[in-house]
Amino acid sequence: MHTEKREMFYKEIEDFWHDLYGTEYALYDVHTESSHIIDSIKEAANQIGELFFKTAPLLRSLDDQTLFSLGFPKDTLPYLRLKTMDTESVISRLDFAVTTDQIKLLELNADTPTFIKELFYVNELVCRHFQVQNPNKLEEKKLALALKHAIFEAYNELDRTNYPNVVFSSHDTHEEDKLTTLYLMKLADVDATYVPLSQLRIVPSSTVEEGEHIEAGVYDQYGQKIDVLYRQTYPLEHLIEDEDPSTHEKVGHMLLTLAQQKQVAIINPPSAFLLQSKAVQALIWALHEQHHPFFTKEEHHIIETYFLPTYLEEDPFIERKQAFVKKPSFGREGDTVEIYNKDGIKIDEDQHKTYQEYTAVYQQFIPLPTATMKTQTQTIEAHIMYGCFLLNGKASAVGIRAGNQITDNESYYLPIGLK
């Protein structure tokens, strides 16, 4: 019965992936939370967002060797100091462990956060269906404004006078990425087209083809030069490695060079990638432990309250006999994450090892709280992790992913309502 109700409800939602990889993803259930907890998460998110954005100019002032030691791939170093917009990141997401007495930051996804359509759009429909209030009720309008503003700000930085050619792009073979990108394009409500990444054409320098002069730039499938390229779901660390399959040209490098030359504007901007490395948290924690004057007394208090001790080595935890998590400085969906007990013995790990080549960071382990919820087949108890989006650094929609202690790509989307 539950399965049929779920199917009937979710199949009415257009362009939504309630099942992923052939398994249940969106739960037909709602977790109710007090407005006090939601407000506390948002307050934490606002303060943490400010701290990260304050740290970005400091990162841009570091030399290449230091940035390399913070896990940034060597190929990205020439582009890390690019500042193309006022904001460091248009859409980012903070992940939290939330218990009754504390809120602790696990990580920031500043570059390509997903979970957008679920929280800004689907959550409202679920709340209406279950007749509870939606904590994210006003957030979709804010997202629409943030998108529109970002597109025109990015375009204005190019100093052009033509009507902007705005393109939203993703891998069209990945359902979640494509549908998220199409949702954002519709919400932005600007004259834009969707072009799969595979159909973009990059012209690294001005050339002549069949007697026609072609400017350096990124072109859509109709041969029109793109002004603003929105790449919400395509991580920069993947982009930088991209090669043309036939010519083996480094198209990722070319694209970022064109952004550097103001031939195209990219959103999220390259500055978002600068905050993506989890080693940035280790840097913030190191400055905090040194009582460094870079942060004010109030900011040190915020770090003490919400951040977990994070280092580029495991020794502090071994010495203090504390459990810790080892995770790659760049990584998604719990991939390559390992948990160690206070004796330094591995007790849990994600089976995927995609990001092993990246610098590791070590963070104090904090158990995720659990909650009960209904799946298609049974009522289960699962670990829950809260996400809170930042729009231009300001707290926005809140939501829950449920699953294992290591939140991976098999976790559920658990809708959230107000008590």
Model features per residue range: what roles?
Residues 1-419:
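Preference for protein termini
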